[in-house]
Structure formats: structure tokens, C-alpha cells
């Protein structure tokens, strides 16, 4: 399999997993109706509509803000796709595919709902006080894992082959 095909396949898998989980939680499981659903002592399913970007930053910017975020995301996806096409390592190609798939997944939400669907919440109780992590989704996980893969590839991965 060529590196570009591997990257595209990775992006498609990340996108499919992201959208499938969101659709199932919204319409099959009906998470909105159920509210907070405890899964373990440290993990809940909870529906959160993120109108901003990461961690809810820039939320409430209205339709103009949404359009600007989508335009920026489209440019970023094209730039990442070009980088992926020129990538020389499998790990970088997979990492870029994960980032692209996650970015497209969240962009689809923004187009369809005007916000990103987040649902995963980790929390811990220490000395009687509960500490929550940010609510996130599969696309967010794909983006973070993709960034970690790129960092590993560029900082620790095999050295690039020198030209003769």
C-alpha cells in the first residue's frame, strides 16, 4: 500500500469511527434524553455541544465565527493533505491521516449541527472533590494521537535518509 493510500485509509477510518459513535449516541442511544450516563467510576457519557474550538474556546462567536472556523479548518485540511502526500514515513502519514480524519469529523458536526458533538468525560474524585477533564469525542482522540505520532516521528523516529 502506498503511503498516500495508507494516510487516506487512516483518515477514512478515523472519520467513520467518529461519525458512527456520534450518530449512535445521538439517535440510537439517545444520549440527550438520558443525560449523564455513568460508565465507570471515572468515566461518563454526557452530551455537550461545543460551539467553540478546543476546550470551548471562542464559543458564542455566532454564524460569522462558525464560517471563519470552517474556512480555516478547510485550509488546514488541504495543507495537511499536501504534507501527507509528501510524507516520507509511515508514522507521519498515519499521524496526518488521523488529524485529517478527526478534523473532517468535527467539521461535519459544525456543518450539520452548528456545534461539535462531544460526549466522553473522564473525572476523578480527590479528597471529596470531583475534578473533570474536558468533554471530548473520537475525532479529538484521533487528532491528539496524530499529533503525538508526528512528534514522535520528527523527534525520535528513524533519521531521514541523506541525499547522495
UniProtKB/Swiss-Prot annotation:
TM spans (from-to): 6-26, 39-59, 65-85, 88-108, 141-161
Localization terms from the record: Cell inner membrane
Pathway: Protein modification; lipoprotein biosynthesis (signal peptide cleavage)
Reaction equation(s) it catalyzes: Release of signal peptides from bacterial membrane prolipoproteins. Hydrolyzes -Xaa-Yaa-Zaa-|-(S,diacylglyceryl)Cys-, in which Xaa is hydrophobic (preferably Leu), and Yaa (Ala or Ser) and Zaa (Gly or Ala) have small, neutral side chains
GO terms, biological process: proteolysis
Described function: This protein specifically catalyzes the removal of signal peptides from prolipoproteins.
Protein known as: Lipoprotein signal peptidase
Amino acid at each position: 500500500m502506498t503511503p498516500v493510500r495508507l494516510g487516506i485509509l487512516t483518515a477514512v477510518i478515523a472519520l467513520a469511527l467518529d461519525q458512527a459513535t456520534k450518530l449512535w449516541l445521538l439517535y440510537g442511544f439517545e444520549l440527550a434524553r438520558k443525560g449523564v450516563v455513568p460508565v465507570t467510576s471515572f468515566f461518563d457519557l454526557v452530551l455537550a455541544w461545543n460551539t467553540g474550538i478546543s476546550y470551548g474556546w471562542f464559543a458564542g462567536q455566532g454564524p460569522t465565527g462558525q464560517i471563519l472556523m470552517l474556512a480555516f479548518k478547510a485550509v488546514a485540511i488541504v495543507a495537511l493533505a499536501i504534507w501527507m502526500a509528501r510524507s516520507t514515513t509511515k508514522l507521519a502519514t498515519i499521524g496526518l491521516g488521523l488529524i485529517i480524519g478527526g478534523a473532517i469529523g468535527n467539521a461535519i458536526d459544525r456543518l450539520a449541527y452548528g456545534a461539535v458533538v462531544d460526549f466522553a468525560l473522564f473525572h476523578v474524585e480527590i479528597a471529596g472533590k470531583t475534578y473533570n477533564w474536558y468533554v471530548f469525542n473520537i475525532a479529538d482522540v484521533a487528532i491528539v494521537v496524530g499529533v503525538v505520532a508526528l512528534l514522535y516521528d520528527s523527534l525520535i523516529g528513524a533519521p531521514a535518509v541523506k541525499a547522495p
